[in-house]
């Protein structure tokens, strides 16, 4: 959150920095992480300019025209809470009949693990099958253009030519990264099998690399189809969308690792954690998007398939990511101090939920322990405090209304209600009374507004909450419900 009027010197730079992980994987043409950026950014930008300046007869990918990012306020989601609940209940009641899995050919890829080789084979089988929906014929990436970082040597034998620029593939660029490049030698895919693959396998076994590989192949398809006129952030979220479509396809066929509800949970959380650093501008070179938008794109693909993802070219998705507008926000990453979060945000949450009830919710609410709140604030950010209270007051509201609070349906409604609070804050701001800067004994009104990172803080709080400990396997649906409330407000939350 941020003040629109007053400066509070006691606000400390706590929050999202503690969990903004360095998994900013991928990019068409080559996108580097912070650690590799100093090595490669200038060279990669030169390569971009080379590609954009004139046609490439060896690999005609077209020109990268302006495709402005749509930073307008999202005009609403496409489903209501009751639709999400119906889908969950139907999946619990109806036995799933799997579709036949395709026969795959496991190609020898120098240095690649058997798991990654299988991921690549499955993703290529997916594109071979669904390409007809997009009216093109998928062409497999040449096995000699698939490079784990561990195989990139110092001898310069493995090159990527951008017409006048001939460069050896650089292991430093691949560090904790993955990328796709339109080299004259052929579309080239590089991934870090030393650090990144190990990290993903430890935290999201199987699923992390499957999502990474399927995302990169989204870029492969963009190049094969010459979809190179989008802004970077739209290209990246289209690749996220294609990745989500692959997850659904694999799940329908019982293809590992998408054979359990937990796999889909891991897919969403790993996507959330590969977001851009908080406060990044959406129009920046190599921008991927905040977690809120990247998860939305992944869920678009899972729910709607590759044809919908393809439409990103014509109608870019709504972008909620914003950059910092003041040096103060940048310094504290848009976060209030814990004391300000507790004293300003919590009463706002309480007032919002009380306005939804005909009786006081005080006797129904299970107040969180301060230690829990301080830990959330320190590891996630200021809005985690407000989100935790929103989830608890959602349960209090349900109980006061005589509704059930146990089970997946009520949990999804609480997530939607928490999102509706964010919707209200996004549209109207939060008016609070704070001590005047000129005279601390006097109070004056100021307005809190959502800052960059707040929506991601809400999702992260949700994915680590008791709601999911009590309802394992529904991260996908919980995040979707939160988004419905955030974009459509209270009317979408099926509140009696």
Language model regions located:
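A metal-dependent hydrolase signature that marks the N-terminal structural subdomain at the beginning
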Residues: 32-165, 307-365
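Catalytic zinc-binding patch centered on the HExxH motif and its immediate surroundings
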Residues: 150-190, 358-379, 383
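Short pre-active-site segment immediately N-terminal to the catalytic Zn-binding motif
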Residues: 194-211, 227-233, 375-387, 404-408
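Catalytic Zn2+-binding segment of zinc metalloproteases
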Residues: 217-231, 250-251, 393-408, 421-427
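An active-site-proximal "capping" alpha-helix that borders the catalytic cofactor pocket
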Residues: 233-249, 409-424
């Amino acid at each position: 959150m941020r003040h629109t009027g007053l400066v509070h010197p006691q606000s400390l730079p706590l929050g999202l920095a503690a969990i903004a992980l360095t998994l900013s994987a991928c990019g068409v043409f080559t996108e580097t992480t912070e650690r590799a950026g100093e090595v490669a950014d200038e060279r990669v930008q030169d390569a971009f300019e080379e590609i954009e300046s004139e046609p490439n007869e060896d690999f005609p990918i077209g020109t990268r025209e302006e495709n402005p990012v749509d930073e307008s306020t999202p005009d609403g989601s496409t489903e209501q809470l009751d639709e999400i609940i119906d889908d969950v209940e139907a999946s619990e009641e109806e036995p799933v009949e799997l579709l036949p899995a395709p026969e795959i050919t496991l190609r020898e890829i120098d240095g690649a693990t058997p798991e990654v080789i299988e991921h690549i084979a499955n993703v290529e089988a997916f594109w071979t099958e669904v390409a007809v929906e997009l009216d093109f014929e998928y062409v497999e990436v040449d096995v000699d253009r698939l490079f784990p970082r561990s195989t990139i040597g110092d001898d310069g034998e493995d090159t990527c030519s951008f017409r006048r620029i001939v460069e050896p593939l650089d292991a430093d660029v691949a560090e904790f990264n993955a990328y796709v490049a339109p080299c004259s030698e052929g579309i080239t895919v590089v991934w870090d099998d030393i650090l990144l693959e190990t990290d993903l396998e430890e935290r999201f076994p199987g699923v992390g690399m499957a999502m990474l590989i399927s995302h990169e192949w989204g870029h492969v398809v963009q190049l094969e189809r010459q979809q190179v006129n989008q802004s970077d952030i739209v290209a990246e979220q289209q690749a996220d969308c294609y990745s989500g479509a692959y997850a659904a396809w694999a799940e329908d066929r019982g293809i590992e690792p998408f054979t359990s509800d937990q796999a889909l949970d891991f897919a969403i959380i790993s996507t959330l954690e590969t977001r851009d650093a908080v406060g990044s501008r959406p129009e920046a070179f190599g921008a991927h998007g905040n977690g809120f938008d990247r998860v939305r794109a992944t869920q678009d693909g899972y729910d709607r398939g590759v044809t919908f993802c393809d439409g990103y070219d014509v109608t870019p998705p709504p972008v909620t990511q914003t950059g910092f507008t003041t040096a103060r926000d940048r310094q504290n990453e848009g976060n209030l101090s814990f004391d300000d979060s507790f004293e300003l945000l919590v009463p706002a949450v309480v007032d919002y939920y009380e306005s939804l009830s005909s009786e006081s919710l005080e006797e129904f609410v299970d107040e969180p322990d301060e230690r829990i709140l301080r830990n959330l604030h320190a590891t996630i950010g200021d809005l985690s405090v407000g989100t935790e209270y929103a989830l608890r007051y959602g349960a209090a509201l349900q109980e006061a209304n005589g509704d059930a609070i146990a089970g997946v349906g009520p949990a999804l409604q609480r997530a939607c209600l928490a999102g509706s609070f964010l919707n209200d804050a996004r549209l109207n701001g939060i008016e609070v009374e704070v001590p005047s800067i000129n005279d601390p004994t006097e109070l004056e009104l100021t307005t809190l507004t959502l800052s960059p990172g707040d929506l991601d803080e809400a999702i992260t709080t949700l994915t680590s909450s008791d709601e999911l400990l009590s309802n394992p396997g529904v991260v996908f649906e919980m995040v979707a419900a939160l988004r419905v409330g955030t974009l459509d407000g209270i009317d979408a939350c099926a509140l009696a």
